[in-house]
């Protein structure tokens, strides 16, 4: 049996050509063995009809096995030639034939250097993706922190607004300067709050771009 690797043919047929030839060989061999059993049984029946012939069953079996070895040797020689013809002319794919799944390589050929460059580019893109993912995660954490700060500042602003209203309703001359001071601080906190809101909007836009 041939041991020549036929990987492309195996890809096309779904089985190795050598396996196909082996199955054909075993099928012929089984048929030959079965035929010899039939021939032996026919000879034995013929001998039973000839009582004058002094030939034992053992001699018949020995002769049958000898003939079987002769036939098998001839069959192996013929099958070797048949296998060579089938593997070359029937079960082989010419060098100029491409399988459908391999035609893309013909349309877009590339060298080993180009393949290595492509692998390097893919590796760089993967690193960039990981870096952008880490940056996005950091921005999301910062955004959550800004939201928490904004919530606390809103509480402080509400407290100052309430205090200012109380001073307006129940204020006296003694609280005038305190009221002015509190009002100025309230405006400063409002400015800080607006600054925080603007930063939060910028962070959201940057996160959307990522």
From Swiss-Prot:
The keyword Cell cycle applies. One of its GO terms (cellular component) is MIS12/MIND type complex. InterPro entries: Centromere_Mis12. Residues 124-208 form a coiled coil. The lineage of its organism: Eukaryota, Metazoa, Chordata, Craniata, Vertebrata. It comes from the Eukaryota. GO terms for biological process: attachment of mitotic spindle microtubules to kinetochore; cell division; chromosome segregation; kinetochore assembly; mitotic sister chromatid segregation. Belongs to the mis12 family. Keywords: Cell cycle, Cell division, Centromere, Chromosome, Chromosome partition, Coiled coil, Kinetochore, Mitosis. It is found in: Chromosome, Centromere, Kinetochore. This is Protein MIS12 homolog. Part of the MIS12 complex which is required for normal chromosome alignment and segregation and for kinetochore formation during mitosis. Essential for proper kinetochore microtubule attachments.
């Amino acid at each position: 049996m041939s041991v020549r690797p036929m990987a492309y043919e195996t890809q096309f047929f779904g089985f190795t050509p050598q396996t196909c030839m082996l199955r054909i060989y075993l099928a012929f061999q089984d048929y030959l063995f079965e035929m010899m059993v039939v021939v032996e049984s026919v000879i034995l029946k013929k001998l039973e009809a000839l009582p004058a012939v002094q030939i034992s069953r053992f001699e018949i079996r020995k002769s049958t096995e000898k003939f079987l070895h002769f036939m098998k040797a001839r069959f192996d020689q013929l099958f070797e030639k048949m296998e060579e013809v089938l593997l070359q002319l029937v079960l082989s794919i010419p060098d100029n034939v491409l399988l459908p799944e391999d035609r893309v390589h013909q349309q877009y050929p590339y060298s080993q250097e180009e393949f290595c460059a492509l692998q390097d580019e893919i590796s760089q893109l993967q690193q960039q993706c990981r870096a952008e993912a880490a940056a996005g995660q950091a921005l999301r954490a910062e955004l959550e922190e800004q939201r928490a700060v904004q919530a606390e500042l809103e509480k402080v602003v509400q407290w100052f607004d309430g205090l200012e209203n109380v001073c307006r309703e129940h204020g006296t001359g003694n609280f005038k300067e305190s009221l002015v001071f509190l009002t100025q601080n309230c405006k400063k906190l409002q400015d800080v709050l607006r600054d925080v809101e603007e930063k939060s909007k910028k962070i959201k836009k940057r996160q959307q771009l990522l």
